[in-house]
Each structure stands twice: as structure tokens, then as C-alpha cells.
């Protein structure tokens, strides 16, 4: 009786209470790693080559997440993975924040961000799964705009508000625009530590909020599949995908359609921050 009551209560949770926060939590780690970290590493003296290479490489989990998506069905519920990945990402962002004063901060932070990327990609899979499982087709159509809007709100908050806040904090701690790296590094380290601590706190708070507010009427599957069985099914699906007519034309279109945007997304922040002496625009974080 108590179980039936709990399920009934979960069914009454209005999507407006969890769809915005779930998709905000989906967008925040992606933007923090893909764009915000570029500004941080630039301010802390990492070379453009290393920034472009490593921050691009650690984004691969979002491209390859389909490879482990089927395996999530073998363990627990989708809500479980949403909660774990949100809380884990929050903790790891905290590690990034407090690693900035170590001598090997770049190695520590970039490796930690690689784990966050895997966690964030897994969160995407599980979050979309909750959305599809908990809402009927009419509700999915109704809230499709909400999920897209709050994913983009995360972009504005992270790449807009938090970057500007980093600039204001750096000035507060004594950074002088155009001064040497040695003169400004301490101020920028404190500023970016606070920014990534804020991101960490947001992710943890959303995770705690979702413990109660994220619905989960899913019952873990009683039919246990082995890893090899799931692997064979995945290979079969991929093989079938490539048998579709004109599939290689479609793949080429998908890759080329946003190829230029993909290149400029990573390099543009470096160009905006680079001094005019080396061909950049020399903009401050607040101006960007």
C-alpha cells in the first residue's frame, strides 16, 4: 500500500518543477568545460596550443556516449544515474576549483574535467531517458521548448554571467589588465577558484533538489542481460544503421554542417583574450 502511495505521489510531480533544473544541469557542465575553462586556462598562463588540444579532447565523451548508453539499462534506474552524475560532477568541479593553486594544476584540472565530461555525457543519457519515460507524447511536445530554453540559460549563466563575474573578482583581487602573468596569476587563481566553486555548488544543490523532485516510476528490469549480450545488441544496431540508404551522405552533412562553428568555438575565446600585440583583441573578461 505504501509503495502504491509513493508511485501515486511521484506521478503528480509537475514537470515544471524538474524539467528546467534537469536541463540546466545538463548544459552547465558542457559549457563550463567546453568554453569557460578556455578563459580560465588562458588567464593562468597555459599556451593556446595546449588549451585548444586538451579542452577539445576531453569533450569526446559527449560524442561517444552512444557507446555506453545501452549498458546503463543493466543497472539501477535512470533517476539514479541522473542523481549520481549531478552530485559527482559537483564534487569534481570542487576539486578543479581547489587544484588551481598547485604547481601541476593543469594536469590535475584537465584530468578531473575528463571525468566530469564522462559524467556529464552519462547525465545526458539518463536525463533524456527520464524525460521520455515520465512524460507522455503530449507532455513531451509541450515541454520541448522548456528543456531547450533552460539548456541555453545554462550557456548564458556560465559563459556570460560567470565569466563576467570572474573578471570582476580578478579586479577585486588586484589583477591589472595587460600586466604580466606573474603579476596577475594569484588574482586570477582566486577568481577562477570561486567561479568553479560556484559551479560545484550549483550542481550539488540541483542534485539534492532532484532527490525529491525528480520523478522515477521506472522499475529496474528483472531480466538481466550480460555485458556481452548488450555489446552484441549495440554492434547489431550500429551495423544496421550503416545499411540505411545514403547514410554516408547524411553523416557527411551532419559533420560539415557545423564544422566551421566547431573550429571557431574553441579558438574565438583565445582570440578575444589575446593581446593586440599578438593579433588578438585584448578584451577583458567583463568586456567579453
What does each model-identified segment do?
Residues 70-73, 97, 101, 157-189, ...:
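Transmembrane alpha-helix termini and helix-breaking/packing motifs in multi-pass membrane transporters
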Residues 2-13, 215-251, 278:
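Juxtamembrane intracellular "pre-TM" segments in multi-pass secondary transporters
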Residues 4-62, 248-279:
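Helix-loop boundary and gating motifs at the non-cytosolic
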Residues 63-77:
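Helix-to-loop junctions at the C-terminal end of transmembrane segments
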Residues 200-220:
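C-terminal membrane-cytosol helix-exit motif in multi-pass small-molecule transporters
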Residues 24, 92, 104-123, 256:
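Hydrophobic core of transmembrane alpha-helices in multi-pass small-molecule transporters
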Residues 61-65, 141-170:
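Glycine-rich segments within core transmembrane alpha-helices of 12-TM secondary carriers
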Residues 82-105:
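C-terminal ends and interior cores of transmembrane alpha-helices
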Amino acid at each position: 500500500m505504501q509503495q502504491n502511495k509513493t508511485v501515486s505521489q511521484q506521478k503528480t510531480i509537475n514537470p515544471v518543477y524538474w524539467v528546467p533544473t534537469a536541463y540546466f544541469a545538463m548544459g552547465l557542465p558542457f559549457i563550463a568545460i567546453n568554453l569557460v575553462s578556455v578563459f580560465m586556462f588562458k588567464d593562468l598562463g597555459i599556451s593556446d596550443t595546449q588549451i585548444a588540444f586538451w579542452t577539445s579532447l576531453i569533450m569526446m565523451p559527449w560524442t561517444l556516449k552512444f557507446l555506453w548508453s545501452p549498458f546503463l539499462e543493466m543497472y539501477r534506474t535512470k533517476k539514479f544515474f541522473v542523481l549520481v552524475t549531478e552530485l559527482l560532477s559537483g564534487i569534481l568541479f570542487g576539486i578543479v576549483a581547489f587544484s588551481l593553486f598547485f604547481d601541476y594544476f593543469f594536469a590535475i584540472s584537465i584530468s578531473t574535467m575528463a571525468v566530469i565530461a564522462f559524467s556529464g555525457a552519462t547525465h545526458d543519457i539518463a536525463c533524456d531517458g527520464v524525460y521520455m519515460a515520465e512524460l507522455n507524447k503530449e507532455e513531451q511536445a509541450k515541454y520541448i521548448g522548456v528543456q531547450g530554453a533552460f539548456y541555453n540559460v545554462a550557456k548564458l549563466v556560465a559563459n556570460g554571467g560567470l565569466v563576467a563575474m570572474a573578471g570582476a573578482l580578478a579586479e577585486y583581487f588586484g589583477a591589472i589588465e595587460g600586466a604580466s602573468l606573474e603579476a596577475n596569476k594569484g588574482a586570477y587563481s582566486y577568481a577562477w577558484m570561486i567561479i568553479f566553486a560556484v559551479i560545484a555548488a550549483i550542481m550539488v544543490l540541483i542534485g539534492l533538489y532532484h532527490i525529491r523532485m525528480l520523478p522515477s516510476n521506472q522499475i529496474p528490469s528483472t531480466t538481466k542481460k550480460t555485458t556481452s549480450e548488450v555489446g552484441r545488441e549495440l554492434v547489431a544496431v550500429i551495423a544496421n544503421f550503416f545499411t540505411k540508404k545514403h547514410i554516408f551522405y547524411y553523416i557527411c552533412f551532419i559533420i560539415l554542417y557545423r564544422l566551421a562553428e566547431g573550429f571557431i568555438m574553441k579558438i574565438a575565446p583565445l582570440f578575444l583574450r589575446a593581446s593586440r600585440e599578438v593579433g588578438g583583441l585584448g578584451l577583458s573578461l567583463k568586456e567579453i
